[in-house]
Amino acid sequence: ALFSELKRDLDVLPIYEVLVQHYPKKQYWTQLSGLYGQKDRPMDQMGALEAAYDDGLLNKQREFTALSQLLFMFENPRKAANVLQDGFNKKVIKEEEKTLKALAQYWHASKELSKAKPYYKKAAKISKEGELYIFLGQVHFGLDEFSDAREAIKLGLKKGKLKDEAGAHMLLGQILFENQEWDSAIVSFRKCIDVAEKQYSVKKKKQKDKDKQKD
């Protein structure tokens, strides 16, 4: 209790920095990581969590996800993927949309397309939006799996709520072209143009409405 009161009045960061050197317990590493975070020192925040992970001390989902997010932020997607994958393997991390999506994206960013594929597939099935099927289609396309890529993109378009519907039609056209489905490819490219024109018209109208409100 006394130490808790002192923590409110003192900068305890140096104390924890000494503690982890002599008594490298999980609670000291995680608290040190949190203190670095409060002081806007994300690299040190990551380093403290990484040290705890390397010593096998992390055992909660939020700890694995926090470390993987920091690693990804500092452009180390492969280690981010390995950390999160380890959490899945140890049954520490639940298979839910956000965790499956994160692992898929980390493997994707690491150019490990075959490893990203099953996690995009699981996440896409759970998601209420079609975006993850588009990512799955990109992965299949990158692996020259044109038929699977085509089906994934179609599922994404069907599910809808896409950030870039025109881009999805463009990608589908490319896949169909590579699969020598010429007529279908042309239809997709035309659909891409139609959707892009509609999106531009909507955007232009919104801008006009904003300008009118300013006047």
Please report, for each region that a protein language model flagged, where it lies by residue:
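Alpha-solenoid helical repeat scaffolds
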Residues: 1-215
